């Protein structure tokens, strides 16, 4: 179910504060966050945000096509290694 339009998109307050501070200084640095549920808003464009995937922080450069998506969509948590090969010896 999508979020109601009368509600604003969720962005963690600490993340929003860091981005606003960097925008006023016109600086670029990597912002580390654990907030995967935060929505990408236009003020984040051009920043690099390191999103936690459960094990490490993955740096993601934010572009205009990402606006409206959640940060967690760009940091996969599971690495699929493929199905087990057909080994007849292990079945016996």
From Swiss-Prot:
Residue runs in coiled coils: none
UniProt xrefs under Pfam families: Ribosomal_S19 (PF00203)
GO cellular component, one term: mitochondrial small ribosomal subunit
Keyword Transferase belongs to the record: no
Keyword presence, Signal: no
GO biological process: ribosomal small subunit assembly; translation
GO molecular function: rRNA binding; structural constituent of ribosome
Main location: plastid
Domain of life: Eukaryota
Record keywords, A-Z: Chloroplast, Plastid, Ribonucleoprotein, Ribosomal protein, RNA-binding, rRNA-binding
Subcellular locations according to the entry: Plastid, Chloroplast
Ranges that cross the membrane: none
Family: Belongs to the universal ribosomal protein uS19 family.
Biological function: Protein S19 forms a complex with S13 that binds strongly to the 16S ribosomal RNA.
NCBIfam families in the record: rpsS_bact (TIGR01050)
Protein name in UniProt: Small ribosomal subunit protein uS19c
Organism of provenance: Aethionema grandiflorum (Persian stone-cress)
Protein encoded by which gene: rps19
């Amino acid at each position: 179910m999508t979020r109601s339009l009368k509600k604003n998109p969720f962005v963690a307050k600490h993340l929003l504060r860091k981005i606003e501070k960097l925008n006023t200084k016109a600086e670029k640095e990597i912002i580390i966050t654990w907030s995967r549920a935060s929505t990408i808003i236009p003020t984040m464009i051009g920043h690099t945000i390191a999103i936690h995937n459960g094990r490490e922080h993955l740096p993601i450069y934010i572009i205009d096509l990402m606006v409206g998506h959640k940060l967690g969509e760009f940091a996969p948590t599971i690495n699929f290694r493929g199905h087990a090969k057909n080994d007849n010896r292990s079945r016996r």
